């Protein structure tokens, strides 16, 4: 398993299927500005100019919304994951 550094977060995108009111499956979600993802690992946070550690706002296991074009896709064993900065995460889904 990869261990992210600083304010980086490792996520795995969740495939979502969008349906219209009539129940038709809409082709692709390319029109969306965000994607849904599951947080797999979180870095320790970032340090301020005074050296204080600011902990991340997300935790392992959270479901989050991430900007569509954010991150770097890497391979972790047989699994493709994406490394993003915490600032690329728009919201935590509750």
Swiss-Prot record:
| Coiled-coil residue windows | none
Q: Name one GO molecular function term.
A: protein folding chaperone
Gene3D superfamilies according to UniProt: GroES chaperonin
Q: Name one GO cellular component term.
A: cytoplasm
Key words of the record: Chaperone, Cytoplasm
The role this protein plays is: Together with the chaperonin GroEL, plays an essential role in assisting protein folding. The GroEL-GroES system forms a nano-cage that allows encapsulation of the non-native substrate proteins and provides a physical environment optimized to promote and accelerate protein folding. GroES binds to the apical surface of the GroEL ring, thereby capping the opening of the GroEL channel.
Entry protein name: Co-chaperonin GroES
